[in-house]
């Protein structure tokens, strides 16, 4: 699935099942929450902490949650993620680490 297809898929899902998008500020808060959940799994999987009994720890699901909400924000604010990714990939935008 391309980023363009993902943006369309999320938009169709929101309009069909979600009724409408949450406000941009609410979605920013939700994105922060999802990143926190991802960070918890990373800390317990690769860091010094351990999982608590019964704690959810599907890394892929959490990454997908982060991407979903990021796509929601892009859709709401009119950002084409494909073009934005191409833009930041230009040599003048990113300096390779030597």
What are the language-model segments listed below?
Residues 1-63, 67-89:
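Flexible "arm" and connector segments at domain edges
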Residues 86-98:
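Single conserved hydrophobic/aromatic residue that forms the stacking wall/gate
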């Amino acid at each position: 699935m391309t980023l363009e297809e993902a943006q369309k898929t999320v938009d169709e899902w929101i309009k069909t099942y979600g009724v409408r998008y949450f406000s941009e500020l609410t979605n920013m808060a939700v994105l922060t929450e999802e990143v926190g959940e991802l960070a918890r799994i990373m800390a317990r999987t690769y860091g010094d902490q351990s999982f608590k009994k019964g704690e959810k720890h599907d890394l892929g699901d959490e990454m997908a949650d982060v991407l979903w909400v990021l796509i929601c924000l892009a859709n709401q604010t009119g950002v084409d993620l494909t073009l934005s990714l191409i833009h930041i990939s230009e040599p003048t935008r990113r300096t390779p680490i030597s």
